């Protein structure tokens, strides 16, 4: 894990459908620091993560990663609301795809399958999984390859208590190794975040 992991937003603004979600938002995260993003539905939590991930355009401002020689998308793992799994593929086939695509290591996926209790299900089509099992499968990509920046949108949704603990431990370990994390979550997590950002619903014009 690069010890130079960092992420900064400089006076960024987001506009969706002609509505300003947030404006002049700034933060700076150094190695080992996490940012917890909270706020009501519609305040822009998902939009913020998608902007950082390069999936939505900035209305104003700029985003910077720690290593300017590497494109920002190559520095992060993004787990959004949609699990991003192929229903027709087995759990193992989904995981193998992430390892190949991310040029990662299958040993990390093996560990994730064990910790999330997915080993006995690995040969089943992902479409047969429950909502919680699909979420656990989606989160295994965090273990498929080392990326210094984690962007997680409601990562604990549909998870049971034991799996939330696994997630908590994974985020804490990532930060302890010098990584950076931006997490939007309604569910309380035990991870100690260095910073918290509370977004508010902007009044309609």
PLM regions: where:
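Q-loop/switch helix immediately C-terminal to the Walker
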Residues: 82, 87-103
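Helix-to-loop junction immediately C-terminal to a conserved catalytic motif
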Residues: 53
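Catalytic Walker B motif of ABC-type/P-loop ATPase nucleotide-binding domains
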Residues: 150-154
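Conserved ABC ATPase "signature" region
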Residues: 107-122, 140
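Hydrophobic anchor residue at the start of the ABC signature
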Residues: 139, 178
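Conserved ABC ATPase signature
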Residues: 125-132
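Conserved ABC transporter NBD signature motif
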Residues: 57-74
